[in-house]
């Protein structure tokens, strides 16, 4: 995610794109950094992965035989050697930053060096249909708990505990939010526009969900109706159940959207209903790939078999993504791996798509 062209050229390019291009809906670019200490087994491991919308496109792993930022999507492979060199150097610099931040966190929390600890950082930008910043974010976590986060105004911080308040005071004194805001409003959006253009066929597609409802008897008195959406992209989708037109949100079991392993996603929503009253329930599906929302009912004559194989495959892929990327459950609260008490270092260039000028340093 590093810029390979001179910044002046990039700004001209992004300005041209902003004037001539529009995008359906909003789009996002996010980076997830994770550093894990392992006492007695060498330096902490550092992994960063980059996503445009729901597509992973780059990955760096400090444990690789020859650590480099590597492509994870065909459309990013067109970037030249300078891009990959710059992204690699930014990732290596962040790895060193987070290793130092792990040491600082031990002091802040009065912890022993004998245990393993984790720092996570999630940051990025959302862009609206007009090609401009919709929202920016930077959130960090330590050992799976919120640490510090940039507020929506992009100019202030929220610290989760007294240790994080030390970091907050340092960053406020150094006006770190200003640097981060400049990256989010400028470089981040510029690169997101570029990636959307280069990966147009993949990133700007909308795969229509394949939908159906299945029926699962629980007893003589109750049954589960499960509404399925399969093979859709992008991942954002809404599934809701209604009874006689009234939302059943409180009574609905809803699973997280899952990758299917082929670049699409899966999701289901279930509700327990009294036997014999199934016809009173409707499932409503909203997705970018649909010209209008769908309304589904269970049709007894077309009872479907649950696609267990597909769901199991999706879960397996999800496990690989989570474990392999070591991005754990930090997304759940949008935690990230910022430096505990760190400050942003002025790295070699602000042209990195990762934002080398917002690297958290102790």
UniProtKB/Swiss-Prot annotation:
Where in the sequence does glycosylation occur per the annotation? 110
For this UniProt entry, which segments traverse the membrane? 309-332
User: What are the protein's UniProt keywords?
Assistant: Disulfide bond, Glycoprotein, Immunity, Membrane, MHC I, Signal, Transmembrane, Transmembrane helix
Task: Tell me the GO BP annotations in alphabetical order.
Answer: antigen processing and presentation of endogenous peptide antigen via MHC class I via ER pathway, TAP-independent; antigen processing and presentation of endogenous peptide antigen via MHC class Ib; immune response; positive regulation of T cell mediated cytotoxicity
Region named Alpha-1: 25-114
Q: What is its main location?
A: membrane
Instruction: Cite the ranges annotated as topological domain Cytoplasmic.
Output: 333-362
Is Amino-acid biosynthesis set as a keyword in this record? no
Residues forming the Ig-like C1-type domain are 209-295
Report the SUPFAM superfamilies cross-referenced here: Immunoglobulin, MHC antigen-recognition domain
Record flagged with keyword Cell membrane: no
Q: Where is this region: Disordered?
A: 335-362
Give the UniProt entry's GO cellular component terms: early endosome membrane; ER to Golgi transport vesicle membrane; external side of plasma membrane; extracellular space; lumenal side of endoplasmic reticulum membrane; MHC class I protein complex; phagocytic vesicle membrane; recycling endosome membrane
Where do the record's region annotations for Alpha-3 lie?
207-298
Region (Alpha-2), start-end ranges:
115-206
Please give the name of this protein: Class I histocompatibility antigen, Gogo-B*0103 alpha chain
Function, as annotated, reads: Involved in the presentation of foreign antigens to the immune system.
The organism of origin for this protein: Gorilla gorilla gorilla
Instruction: Report how it sits in the membrane.
Output: Single-pass type I membrane protein
